[in-house]
């Protein structure tokens, strides 16, 4: 019998809690990640007030220097620790795949200076359309169509861009490049990015409509992902008949593998929290696992190096945490964590190699305290043990520490 009938894992995308031991091997604009500290530097430079996470024990997580504006809690309502990544990457897919039990020894490729000419030329030859070279770099999805949409409407050229993650994105105005044509181009791009030196996690079709100055991305987005190279705990749960619910980009990250119920993409963190709450309220969701990603921390504030915006985003989540808890049952378990860091005060604009926090809460807890410090995959090992399925490649369960 399961200790918890339902477990809800919420990933606060990029909310790291201090440089990992191997941060010297990862870089931002030529600077090693050794001094990165997402939560620490936000609390230091912008101030941070997250009383609901403090109650669970956020401020009690072991750190060389305590979080400046996040106090410790003498009698927390939950259990906390920090977890280290073992995989050779600091991107979204690597972090999430490891959380679900995989050790990624061959990281995906990222293209901070844009894609090489060889890839662009192949896409041009296949599509019969030119590519706007100035867009070929890490770019905000809304900014790139604002900047190059008018030109695309005049010339029919493709807008090809990337991000901090191993993705190739193609934006196309639906009146200029029909959606079906865009999909065919993306399918081709997927076929040429399945191995080094261009091993990409996802190709994303990004259709949009509107006029210059008023472009809007449509619901016709389509992701061409790769499935995890081995079964994750999601697969093991699904195979055992345990329902799995994906909120936000979780379904895309795992290419639908092991997901029995996709609750859709998030328009914002707040929308994602709304979707999570609706998921918690589903009458048929009496047992199982929900997995939510809230990406605004990373996409809107981490990469843009905006510590004040990042702080406000954390405040927004913390303010809504009681709503999430209010919709949980007594024998539910809530796990709050991250997938990598993205220190908004650091050099460059890339993710940072950091520990991630882990907060565990259940109304059924009679104890509290620290969970032994471990690794990302300990989360999935704990979920697996709770539901009586095998763990994946790696991970040590901390289920026995939750009392």
Swiss-Prot record:
Q: Which residues form the signal peptide?
A: none
Q: In which pathway does it act?
A: Carbohydrate degradation; 2-deoxy-D-ribose 1-phosphate degradation; D-glyceraldehyde 3-phosphate and acetaldehyde from 2-deoxy-alpha-D-ribose 1-phosphate: step 1/2
Q: Where on this chain does Mn(2+) 1 bind?
A: 13, 339-340
Q: What are the subcellular locations of this protein?
A: Cytoplasm
Q: Domain of life of the organism in this record? A: Bacteria
Q: Please tell me whether the keyword Metal-binding is annotated for this protein.
A: yes
List GO BP terms, alphabetically: 2-deoxyribose 1-phosphate catabolic process; 5-phosphoribose 1-diphosphate biosynthetic process; metabolic compound salvage; nucleotide metabolic process
Q: Does the keyword Isomerase apply?
A: yes
EC numbers listed for it are 5.4.2.7
Grouped into one coarse class, the protein's main location is cytoplasm
One of the Pfam families matching this protein, by short name: Metalloenzyme
Reactions catalysed, semicolon-separated, are: 2-deoxy-alpha-D-ribose 1-phosphate = 2-deoxy-D-ribose 5-phosphate; alpha-D-ribose 1-phosphate = D-ribose 5-phosphate
**Gene Ontology CC terms:** cytosol
What cofactor is this protein dependent on? Mn(2+)
An example of a GO molecular function for this protein is: phosphopentomutase activity
Per the annotation, how and in what number is the cofactor bound? Binds 2 manganese ions.
Which keywords does this Swiss-Prot/TrEMBL entry list?
A: Cytoplasm, Isomerase, Manganese, Metal-binding
What role is this protein assigned? Isomerase that catalyzes the conversion of deoxy-ribose 1-phosphate (dRib-1-P) and ribose 1-phosphate (Rib-1-P) to deoxy-ribose 5-phosphate (dRib-5-P) and ribose 5-phosphate (Rib-5-P), respectively.
Q: Which NCBIfam families match?
A: deoB, PRK05362.1
According to its UniProt record, which protein family does this protein belong to?
Belongs to the phosphopentomutase family.
Q: What is this protein called?
A: Phosphopentomutase
Provenance organism: Streptococcus pyogenes serotype M18 (strain MGAS8232)
Gene it is expressed from: deoB
């Amino acid at each position: 019998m399961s200790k918890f009938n339902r477990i809800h894992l919420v990933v606060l995308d990029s909310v790291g809690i201090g440089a990992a031991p191997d941060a010297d091997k990862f870089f931002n604009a030529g600077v090693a990640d050794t001094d990165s500290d997402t939560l620490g530097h936000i609390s230091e430079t912008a101030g941070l007030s997250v009383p609901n996470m403090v109650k669970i024990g956020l401020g009690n997580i072991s750190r060389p220097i305590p979080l400046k504006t996040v106090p410790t809690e003498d009698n927390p309502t939950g259990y906390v620790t920090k977890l280290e990544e073992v995989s050779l990457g600091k991107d979204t897919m690597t972090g999430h795949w490891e959380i679900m039990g995989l050790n990624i020894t061959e990281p995906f490729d990222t293209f901070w200076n844009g894609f090489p000419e060889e890839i662009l030329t192949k896409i041009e030859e296949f599509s019969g359309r030119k590519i706007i070279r100035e867009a070929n770099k890490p770019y905000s999805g809304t900014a790139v169509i604002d900047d190059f949409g008018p030109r695309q409407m005049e010339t029919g050229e493709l807008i090809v861009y990337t991000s901090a993650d191993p993705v190739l994105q193609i934006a196309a105005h639906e009146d200029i490049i029909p959606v079906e044509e865009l999909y065919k181009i993306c399918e081709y791009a997927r076929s040429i990015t399945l191995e080094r030196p261009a091993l990409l996690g996802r190709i994303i079709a990004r259709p949009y409509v509107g006029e210059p100055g008023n472009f809007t991305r449509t619901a016709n987005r389509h992701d061409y992902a790769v499935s995890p190279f081995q079964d994750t705990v999601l697969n093991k749960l699904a195979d055992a008949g345990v329902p799995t619910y994906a909120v936000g980009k979780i379904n895309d990250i795992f290419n639908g593998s092991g997901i029995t119920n996709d609750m859709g993409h998030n328009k914002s963190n707040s929308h994602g929290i709304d979707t999570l709450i609706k998921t918690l309220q589903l009458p048929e969701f009496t047992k199982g696992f929900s997995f939510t990603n809230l990406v605004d921390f990373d996409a809107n504030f981490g990469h843009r190096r905006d510590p004040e915006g990042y702080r406000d985003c954390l405040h927004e989540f913390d303010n809504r945490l009681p709503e999430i808890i209010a919709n949980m049952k007594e024998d539910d378990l809530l796990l709050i964590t991250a997938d990598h860091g993205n220190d908004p005060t650091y050099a460059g604009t890339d993710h940072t190699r950091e520990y991630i926090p882990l907060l565990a809460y259940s109304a059924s807890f009679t104890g509290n305290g620290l969970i032994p410090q471990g690794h990302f995959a300990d989360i999935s090992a704990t979920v697996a043990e709770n539901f009586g399925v095998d763990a994946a490649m790696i991970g040590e369960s901390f289920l026995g520490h939750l009392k």
